[in-house]
Amino acid sequence: MTGRAFLTGATGFVGSHVARALCNAGWRVKALVRRSGNPRQLGIGDLPVEIVPGDLSAHTDLADAVSGSDAIVHVAGLVRARTLDDYREGNVLATVRLLRAAHQRAPDALVVLVSSQAAAGPARDGRQVCEGDVARPVSGYGLSKREGEEAVEREWKGP
């Protein structure tokens, strides 16, 4: 499958690698980049990526940006914050805004959320954590990432 992919977090470590992989696979990539970001300095300057200035706090930015996307890959996330509410703003509410914009402008898109091991919490009794295990995050970051996963499960009614 190839087509038009909308990517958040493209200037971060994981996101820049996702951008490169999408481009190498033949996707046309549109990346949401904070107005303060410089893609040339952030790992994607050499890629044929369409840069869309904006952020996840503005629904209008998102609705226009996701329009016509075949896939939405949400890598962006808040890793450091002072309070749980700040984490929730960056990792839950931003995700919900993105999903609602997608419902309006790209309802048939494939949605991929990149989360974190922190959402599951640490392994217990020396065994691997599996998808079906009960999540037991131990930090505000992990809790907010788990809540972001739950938001996708609850909010996304795509194809």
Where are these regions (language model features)?
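N-terminal Rossmann NAD(P)H-binding glycine-rich loop of SDR-like oxidoreductase domains
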Residues: 3-27
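Conserved Rossmann-fold NAD(P)-dependent oxidoreductase catalytic core, especially the SDR/UDP-sugar
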Residues: 79, 96-140
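NAD(P)H-binding glycine-rich loop region in Rossmannoid oxidoreductase-like domains
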Residues: 53-93, 101, 119-120
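Conserved internal alpha-helix in NAD(P)-dependent oxidoreductase domains
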Residues: 89-96, 132, 143, 147
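Active-site Tyr-X1-5-Lys
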Residues: 138-159
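SDR active-site strand-loop-helix element
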Residues: 8, 32, 72-76, 111-117
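Short, conserved SAM-binding/catalytic segment
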Residues: 38-49
